[in-house]
Amino acid sequence: MARIAGVDLPRDKRVEIALTYIYGIGRSRSKEILAKAGVNPDTRVRDLTEDEVSKLREIIEKEYKVEGDLRKEVAMNIKRLIDIGCYRGIRHKLGLPVRGQRTRTNARTRKGPRKTVAKKKK
């Protein structure tokens, strides 16, 4: 099993798809990496040679921020927004939508389950 950036790639998938299992690599970036490495995107992971795997690993480590480093950078960006107290930071802190979506209805994913208020008894 090929292990790149701390992720075990699924053996039965095409390399182009398998690389997307790494956080920070999508389909277009996967194609870009394979072109640089000179690997056929239709090759299955189990059919990759050790040389090809090491070439892919080297390209990803050198040129792209993936997995832990990328997660850390995103977390630091959000923390910075919170620390400077800007609108986006406040929305992150309150757990509300950040990009201007409506909140009177919807926004349940961001706000969590409804907190129902009991009706006043007579």
Swiss-Prot record:
Please give the Gene3D superfamilies that the UniProt record associates with this protein.
1.10.8.50, 30s ribosomal protein s13, domain 2
What GO biological process terms are annotated to this protein in UniProt? translation
- Alphabetized UniProt keyword annotations: Ribonucleoprotein, Ribosomal protein, RNA-binding, rRNA-binding, tRNA-binding
Which GO-annotated molecular functions does the record name?
A: rRNA binding; structural constituent of ribosome; tRNA binding
Where, if anywhere, are coiled coils annotated?
none
Segments for region (Disordered): 97-122
| Basic residues bias locations | 101-122
Write down the InterPro entries for this protein, in alphabetical order: Rbsml_uS13_C, Ribosomal_uS13, Ribosomal_uS13-like_H2TH, Ribosomal_uS13_bac-type, Ribosomal_uS13_CS
Task: Say which domain of life the source belongs to.
Answer: Bacteria
Region forming the signal peptide: none
Matching PROSITE patterns: RIBOSOMAL_S13_1, RIBOSOMAL_S13_2
| Keyword rRNA-binding included in the entry's annotation | yes
Q: Which Pfam families match?
A: Ribosomal_S13
> One Gene Ontology cellular component annotation?
cytosol
Q: Tell me the PANTHER family matching this sequence.
A: 30S RIBOSOMAL PROTEIN S13/40S RIBOSOMAL PROTEIN S18 (PTHR10871), SMALL RIBOSOMAL SUBUNIT PROTEIN US13M (PTHR10871:SF1)
Q: How does it assemble?
A: Part of the 30S ribosomal subunit. Forms a loose heterodimer with protein S19. Forms two bridges to the 50S subunit in the 70S ribosome.
Q: What does this protein do?
A: Located at the top of the head of the 30S subunit, it contacts several helices of the 16S rRNA. In the 70S ribosome it contacts the 23S rRNA (bridge B1a) and protein L5 of the 50S subunit (bridge B1b), connecting the 2 subunits; these bridges are implicated in subunit movement. Contacts the tRNAs in the A and P-sites.
State the similarity comment.
Answer: Belongs to the universal ribosomal protein uS13 family.
HAMAP family named among the record's database cross-references: Ribosomal_uS13
Q: Please report the name of this protein according to its UniProt entry.
A: Small ribosomal subunit protein uS13
